[in-house]
A protein has these predicted regions:
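Histidine- and aromatic-rich segments of cupredoxin/plastocyanin-like copper-binding domains
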Residues: 1-154
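C-terminal substrate/ligand-recognition segments
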Residues: 152-158, 162-215
Length: 215
């Protein structure tokens, strides 16, 4: 067996854990639930959708996105199959609402499914979480049409701000930024105190990567 140590594409386990539990199921009442979702995977990006079937995607099932890492959205966003799922990258967070009261009594199970993501090595769809629908209860809660107040931000950057572009590429198994490998002795950007700069990150590496800056 030959292992190519220059061909790494992250670590993909064959079982997805939710809150540390494999093959998780959750008993729910037939009402609205608000969930906070964090992608804690080291390498995997998800596209989440609700389905009435464990193996195939059913049509017309939905979830409503109400918040992101930055807090409440201005308005809720409803995602229904098969048109759209919730794409969630590594370390991203979302808050969603699923209305289990919308399903008739003969529907006993729902599944939170990963539709697969092209950049993942194993992009096959799979069920992540099973909801067991139980008793129907009164629920007068509503999802407001207006959520958080989002104040538009004006132009804070002066016209003479310095612009930098950082291109992330992978050639021959080696990661490069602007065609340079990492060197702890080299400084690629050294803004002065009070300077304004606009940085553009371009990912051409072939898959999603959570690029972030260390100061």
């Amino acid at each position: 067996m030959i292992f190519d140590d220059r061909g790494q594409r992250g670590v993909y386990g064959d079982v997805v854990l939710i809150n540390g539990v494999p093959y998780l199921y959750l008993e729910v009442e037939r009402r609205k639930y608000r969930f906070r979702v964090l992608n804690g995977s080291a390498s995997r990006t998800y596209e989440l959708a609700v389905s009435q079937d464990e193996k195939t995607l059913t049509i017309g099932d939905g979830l409503t996105v109400i918040a992101t890492d930055a807090g409440l959205l201005a308005t809720p966003v409803e995602l229904k199959t098969p048109a759209a799922g919730l794409q969630i990258g590594i370390a991203e967070r979302y808050e969603i609402v699923i209305d289990f009261a919308a399903y008739p009594d003969h529907v006993e199970h729902l599944y939170l499914r990963n539709l697969g993501f092209p950049s993942n090595l194993d992009s096959e769809p799979q069920a992540l979480l099973r909801f067991d629908l139980k008793r129907r209860v009164p629920d007068d809660s509503i999802i407001p049409t207006q959520l958080g107040k989002v104040t538009p931000i004006g132009n804070l950057i002066p016209s003479n701000a310095k612009r930098r572009t950082f291109r992330f590429e992978r050639t021959g198994g080696e990661w490069k930024i602007n065609n340079k490998t990492w060197d702890p002795q080299r400084i690629d950007a050294n803004p002065g105190l009070g300077d304004y700069e606009i940085w553009t990150f371009v990912n051409t590496g072939g898959w999603v990567h959570p690029v972030h800056v260390h100061l």
